[in-house]
């Protein structure tokens, strides 16, 4: 048998493969590094050296090791961080227990783990979590298809199949009554096995019952079994055409009556998209938007030409990884390059944003041998440190304010987890417990407790929809209750004061009416595409909306019949707004959608006011001119706003710390105001050279608890369990 030793792309990029004498692949090498594999006598991979470690240490590098039993089952995975994953199997080779690294005990070579049970055919029938709780059970038919599944909270789903094995019905239990009630979804197929209808029951029914009404979605296909129409019974419709290779050449969508979104696609001989042409309706003189694409010999997208002529260029390395993206808007002076560098494992090490005037904003990331990000450094040099447990869960996050380079550690936000990976506790860098959580067997939070003991309890419907939210304490009270219809669409909310709000919904679950406790009712109507076409307030006043084929508002008619008009450019940016009195605002934007020109005038086009914006090559505003006044903006080497000027005179200047927060503001007279922050990044002090000073204190939930002024005045705040200010007290020193 022949094995490839080298693969060379049309661009000359090479990947080399090494084998042993029996044809086992031992190495994979490219321009970025090498992955080394080792095998045992039974041809099982026993080690995988991480590419970064291999580049430093060769065959002595670190990586992941695998151990097997005599049946060839992998029983241990030894990770480079010292973690061990243990696996156990039955006589048929089915994994019956999986112990995660954090639960593994080396002395017993075991630990608490997930357990799996199987039937005589080797099909999984039960899953238990490390605590012994049943998370899922499964039942099958003779063809191995799931007939019934139940989760740990009792949610039951039943499946029915036709004689060809196609699923034709789902029944989801929504009420544990006697008899139980189910939500039904039905599927219909054509003779080729294509799904031609999805039907959602509008009423809850007993098991195997038939709802009185259905919400139906219809599908049709061409002779090649390509999906060509999707529609509902209320006017929504999508249509597709294809070429002989199966590429979509036309996509048409109904937006509103008489307005369709029509997009044409063109491809090259390789089947790669080269042009996207969107017909635009209901948008004045702009009637089409054309986007063009170009590729290299490997099929990587190398150039995008936007409808307004801007260009996006992309370059790749030998492994088809993006190395540079250049955004070019010549008309508006934008020429931004973003360059990427990778390690041998393909992780992004550096990102550099480059401008034509020498600007370079570089950020970097470091990774461990499990490819987890451990350090992120921003352009100013601020480091955010991440530490993980052996199950790859984030256990500590250290901000630039807490990071200590000497120890490569520091005070940070800490997290603890349960055996299923749910976050149990959050502790801030000051050691204060911010929040504690507990979960049901569906991993939904059921209890939330903050640092002050405020306890919020959440309960859920059988199918997982939230049922009510309660606040426990001296007097337990309901904060909110929710009601749903058979489709599990929300139909009512009762607030903490027992005021009910009712919702009318259409078949898609869109709110068509809201009824308030005082008898006031609001109404909503929609286009076939699902956008609001009309709103009716409690007094019967209506506001109407019309849309263009881009799906953006083109007209708004208010309660008095006055109309606002909106027009957009080829890229969807607002280009014209005419208000109810005829006043006009014309706008032009750059490639990033930022305004570069605005002209405001009255209904006759007179009394104009022109505003312009200028940007540097990175797309940062450097000058704004409005009503005869000019404002200039200057940035520091790290991308932060350094100075704002008006007609050449300094208005204000800023200094920032490594975390990007302001540490000093200097006014035109040179008066300096300084800012300090605590280890959590909260503003803790404001002061100046004249002796003025303000200090801020916070509680564990980041709410201001006191403000102390230099003259001795102190303001203290207390809060209720919902975070509302309960008391505010100011005292003189």
Q: Where is each model-derived feature located?
A:
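Beta-strand elements of repeat-based all-beta scaffolds
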Residues: 1-378, 382-495, 499-516, 520-537, ...
């Amino acid at each position: 048998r022949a094995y490839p030793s080298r693969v060379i792309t049309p661009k000359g990029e090479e990947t080399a493969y090494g084998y042993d004498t029996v044809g086992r692949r031992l190495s994979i090498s490219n321009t970025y590094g090498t992955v080394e594999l080792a095998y045992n006598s039974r041809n099982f991979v026993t080690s995988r050296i991480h590419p970064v470690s291999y580049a430093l240490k060769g065959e002595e590098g670190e990586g992941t090791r695998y151990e097997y039993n005599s049946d060839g089952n992998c029983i241990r995975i030894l990770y480079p961080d010292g973690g061990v994953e243990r696996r156990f199997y039955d006589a048929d080779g089915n994994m019956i227990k999986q112990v995660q690294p954090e639960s593994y005990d080396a002395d017993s070579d075991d630990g608490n783990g997930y357990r799996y049970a199987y039937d005589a055919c080797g099909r999984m029938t039960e899953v238990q979590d490390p605590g012994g709780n049943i998370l899922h059970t499964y039942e099958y038919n003779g063809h191995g298809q799931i007939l019934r599944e139940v989760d740990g909270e009792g949610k039951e789903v039943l499946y029915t199949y036709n004689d060809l094995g196609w699923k034709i019905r789902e029944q989801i239990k929504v009420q544990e009554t006697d008899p139980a009630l189910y939500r039904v979804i039905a599927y219909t197929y054509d003779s080729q096995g294509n799904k031609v209808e999805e039907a959602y029951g509008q009423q809850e029914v007993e098991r195997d019952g038939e709802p009185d009404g259905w919400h139906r979605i219809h599908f049709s296909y061409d002779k090649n079994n390509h999906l060509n129409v999707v529609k509902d019974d209320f006017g929504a419709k999508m249509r597709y055409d294809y070429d002989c290779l199966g590429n979509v050449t036309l996509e048409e969508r109904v937006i509103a009556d008489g307005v369709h979104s029509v997009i044409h696609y063109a491809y090259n001989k390789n089947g790669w998209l080269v042009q996207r042409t969107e017909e635009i309706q209901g948008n004045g003189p702009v009637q089409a938007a054309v986007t063009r694409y170009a590729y290299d010999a490997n099929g990587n997208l190398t150039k995008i030409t936007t409808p307004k002529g801007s260009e996006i260029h992309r370059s790749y390395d030998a492994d088809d990884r993006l190395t540079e993206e250049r955004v070019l808007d010549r008309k508006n002076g934008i020429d931004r390059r973003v360059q990427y560098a990778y390690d041998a494992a393909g992780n992004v090490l550096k990102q550099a944003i480059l401008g034509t005037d020498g600007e370079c904003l570089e950020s970097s990331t470091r990774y461990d041998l499990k490819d987890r990000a451990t350090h992120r450094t921003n352009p100013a040099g601020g480091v955010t440190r991440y530490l993980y447990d052996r199950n790859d869960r984030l256990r500590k996050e250290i901000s630039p304010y807490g990071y200590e380079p000497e120890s490569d550690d520091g005070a940070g936000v800490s997290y603890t987890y349960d055996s299923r990976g749910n976050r149990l506790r959050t502790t801030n860098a000051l050691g204060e417990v911010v929040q504690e959580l507990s979960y049901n067997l569906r991993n939904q939070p059921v209890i939330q407790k903050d640092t002050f003991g405020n306890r919020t309890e959440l309960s859920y419907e059988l199918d997982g929809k939230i049922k009510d939210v309660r606040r426990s304490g001296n007097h337990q009270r309901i904060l909110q209750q929710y009601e749903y219809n058979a489709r599990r669409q929300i139909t009512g909310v009762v607030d903490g004061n027992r005021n009910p709000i009712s919702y009318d919904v259409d078949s898609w679950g869109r709110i068509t009416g809201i009824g308030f406790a005082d008898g006031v009712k609001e109404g909503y109507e929609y286009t076939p595409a699902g956008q609001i076409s009309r709103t009716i307030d409690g007094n019967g006043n209506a506001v109407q909306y019309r849309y263009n084929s881009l799906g953006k508002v083109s007209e708004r008619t208010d309660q008095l019949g006055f109309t606002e008009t909106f027009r957009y450019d080829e890229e969807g940016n607002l280009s014209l707004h005419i208000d109810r009195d005829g006043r006009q605002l014309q706008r032009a934007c750059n490639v990033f959608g930022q305004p570069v020109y605005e002209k405001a005038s009255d209904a006759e086009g007179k009394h104009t006011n022109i505003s312009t914006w200028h940007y540097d090559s990175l797309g940062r505003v450097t000058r704004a001119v409005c009503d005869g006044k000019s404002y200039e903006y200057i940035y520091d080497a790290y991308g932060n706003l350094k100075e704002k000027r008006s007609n050449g005179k300094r208005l204000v200047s800023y200094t920032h710390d490594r975390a990007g927060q302001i540490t000093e503001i200097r006014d035109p007279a040179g008066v300096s105001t300084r800012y300090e922050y605590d280890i959590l990044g909260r503003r803790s002090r404001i002061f100046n050279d004249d002796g003025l000073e303000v200090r801020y204190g916070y509680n564990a939930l980041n709410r201001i608890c006191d403000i102390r002024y230099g003259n001795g005045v102190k303001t203290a705040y207390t809060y209720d369990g919902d975070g509302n200010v309960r008391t505010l007290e100011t005292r003189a020193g």
